[in-house]
Amino acid sequence: MPHTLWMVWVLGVIISLSKEESSNQASLSCDRNGICKGSSGSLNSIPSGLTEAVKSLDLSNNRITYISNSDLQRCVNLQALVLTSNGINTIEEDSFSSLGSLEHLDLSYNYLSNLSSSWFKPLSSLTFLNLLGNPYKTLGETSLFSHLTKLQILRVGNMDTFTKIQRKDFAGLTFLEELEIDASDLQSYEPKSLKSIQNVSHLILHMKQHILLLEIFVDVTSSVECLELRDTDLDTFHFSELSTGETNSLIKKFTFRNVKITDESLFQVMKLLNQISGLLELEFDDCTLNGVGNFRASDNDRVIDPGKVETLTIRRLHIPRFYLFYDLSTLYSLTERVKRITVENSKVFLVPCLLSQHLKSLEYLDLSENLMVEEYLKNSACEDAWPSLQTLILRQNHLASLEKTGETLLTLKNLTNIDISKNSFHSMPETCQWPEKMKYLNLSSTRIHSVTGCIPKTLEILDVSNNNLNLFSLNLPQLKELYISRNKLMTLPDASLLPMLLVLKISRNAITTFSKEQLDSFHTLKTLEAGGNNFICSCEFLSFTQEQQALAKVLIDWPANYLCDSPSHVRGQQVQDVRLSVSECHRTALVSGMCCALFLLILLTGVLCHRFHGLWYMKMMWAWLQAKRKPRKAPSRNICYDAFVSYSERDAYWVENLMVQELENFNPPFKLCLHKRDFIPGKWIIDNIIDSIEKSHKTVFVLSENFVKSEWCKYELDFSHFRLFDENNDAAILILLEPIEKKAIPQRFCKLRKIMNTKTYLEWPMDEAQREGFWVNLRAAIKS
């Protein structure tokens, strides 16, 4: 029994492992380029079966806890390995021994509490290494990165347990493009630990407290170009001049991101910045100022020197007590050399006039996403304000009048570029006043419905995209670039109004087509972006766009954004791929040809009908059908006459005086139907003929030259022809009153001619002795 249980357990383990392995394989997908993706696939281990074909492997957000020596052994061509956000706590010493081609390694946010230099020794090609978010206290007992001579980006540290930076940690590293250290809970820093790195383009420091900040600053000031401080509380920061003996600084940009600061500590920070002789750019992102802007003027005048700072950027600055904020008059003297200022999304509603006047070197001012209105803007742009200003950005403020905005800015004599997009102007007056040197105006997303003469004619660049424009007819003789996408225009602007235009972006409008003539009218146009419109793919439009090879150089979004909207059977297809049929492209010629062919067919039919009496056949058919539709007064078997006699009026004497006398006076008498005597007056002749034939046992045709020539006889014979012969009966009796040639009988009476050729007919004898026999034969024929 124990043996049986043991076997069952072994089989269960094997089945479980096989299921897990098949699940791992199913969660990994690789393309032909060796890019394998298996992120968020609930993998418990690195899938087996990986070969040298794999070049990139993404196994992030899984449940991998262990990496063995054999997991990646065959991946000799692997260039990128991403294992972030797993549960990795153990990596065997030689796990990466075959990864000499690896360039990108991400082991962030796992459970690696101890780092080993043996992992990284084989990685001679590594340029990116991310070890953030692992619970190690230090960067190992020996230098981890001394063999990584090609390393460019390094990220180390964590928020909770990384407490110590040692001099050996960065030994061997001489140049890095980016170094990020999460030292949020740093408690110990060995001097000159970061000094071993000769050059770092961008250093990012996460530090909750500022205790060790000055020590680190001393080490990096001569090797770092851009220093970024994150998540730091500087409320109690105090600068000690004795802490720094270094004045030869390489730092050109200093960024404070998510930093807390007070009026006093900001003053201390500025004293620190004084030590950076080459500082050109200062940036504050998502910072909190727990103060009211009350900087001590005496200390500022004595200590603070703005140096060479040219660019100041402030984004999303939070001032809890902004309603008590000072006018910054204590900082006026520090602003005279600044050339570029950005204060974005920081609830700015006014720039004091005196401050504006002190910004003598300011060339670029960005006050986007604030609370500026025309009244306060007028105070900010007072006389002698911003004398050097060339670019002013007031995007997404609370401006409402174009006319007032333009008048307010007239004091800025050197202003050439104005961005007032994302304000709600709605309408545009007929005329406006603007600074005389204006070259660029951005009115995108301002809800305007039309453009007027308010637009200055000095413009070289105009952006009116994302509005409600359905017409653009401004004469702008100097305009070189027009951005008018996402409006309601149905055609390209008139080129004669824009003679200098180089760039036109008119995508996502209501344009359905444009022609070669329209494009050629823009003599200077170099770039056109017209995708995203609902194009009618007519033959002319397709011919123009598909045959012009040079058009692809002008249309920068060709061919992906040029889709057909109609005809319906090509909707959604790219214009360059659509092919229309000949009938769609040459409809006029096709219809003309069909009309000509139809005319010739009708003409030919007419000739044939005339030649072969087709009209007669149609008349007979119609007459017969009409007669057949009329109700009969007598049943088809109700015979009233022995014979219906068809004859010419010129032969009436023979019929009435000889034939009638011989037949009707015979005993028993024959009853004959004669049209002169028996037709019902006033009745349609067709009905009389048809009724008489149907009520007669036989039909006697008295043929003569007169019969053939008589219009009446032909008319009578026409309407009796179908009835006589459509059932192939023998009801016809032919009497040849005088010799006539068969050729004299019309061709259309084909059955009559056939009967004369195939059946015996009675011939009126000239000899009186033979006439008695004639009458005997006639009476016998009628009775048969």
UniProtKB/Swiss-Prot annotation:
Q: How is it modified after translation?
A: Glycosylation of Asn-442 is critical for secretion of the N-terminal ectodomain of TLR2.
Which domain of life does the protein's organism represent? Answer: Eukaryota
UniProt repeat feature LRR, residue ranges: 54-77, 78-101, 102-125, 126-150, 151-175, 176-199, 200-223, 224-250, 251-278, 279-308, 309-337, 338-361, 362-388, 389-414, 415-437, 438-457, 458-478, 479-500, 501-524
Localisation per UniProt entry: Membrane; Cytoplasmic vesicle, Phagosome membrane; Membrane raft
Show which residues sit on the Cytoplasmic side of the membrane.
Answer: 610-784
According to its record, how does it sit in the membrane? Single-pass type I membrane protein
UniProt entry tagged with the keyword Cell division: no
- GO BP annotations listed: apoptotic process; cellular response to bacterial lipopeptide; cellular response to diacyl bacterial lipopeptide; cellular response to lipoteichoic acid; cellular response to triacyl bacterial lipopeptide; cellular response to type II interferon; defense response to Gram-positive bacterium; defense response to virus
Effect noted on mutating residue 199 to D: Prevents addition of N-glycans. Reduces secretion of the N-terminal ectodomain
Molecular functions (GO terms): amyloid-beta binding; identical protein binding; lipopolysaccharide binding; lipopolysaccharide immune receptor activity; NAD+ nucleosidase activity, cyclic ADP-ribose generating; pattern recognition receptor activity; peptidoglycan binding; protein-containing complex binding
Q: Which Pfam families match?
A: LRR_1, LRR_8, LRRCT, TIR
Pull the Extracellular topological domain ranges from the record: 21-588
Q: Where is this motif: ATG16L1-binding motif?
A: 761-778
Domain statement? Ester-bound lipid substrates are bound through a crevice formed between the LRR 11 and LRR 12.
The function of this protein is: Cooperates with LY96 to mediate the innate immune response to bacterial lipoproteins and other microbial cell wall components. Cooperates with TLR1 or TLR6 to mediate the innate immune response to bacterial lipoproteins or lipopeptides. Acts via MYD88 and TRAF6, leading to NF-kappa-B activation, cytokine secretion and the inflammatory response. May also activate immune cells and promote apoptosis in response to the lipid moiety of lipoproteins.
Which protein are we looking at?
Toll-like receptor 2
Organism of this sequence: Homo sapiens
Organism classification, top ranks? Eukaryota, Metazoa, Chordata, Craniata, Vertebrata
**Gene for this chain:** TLR2
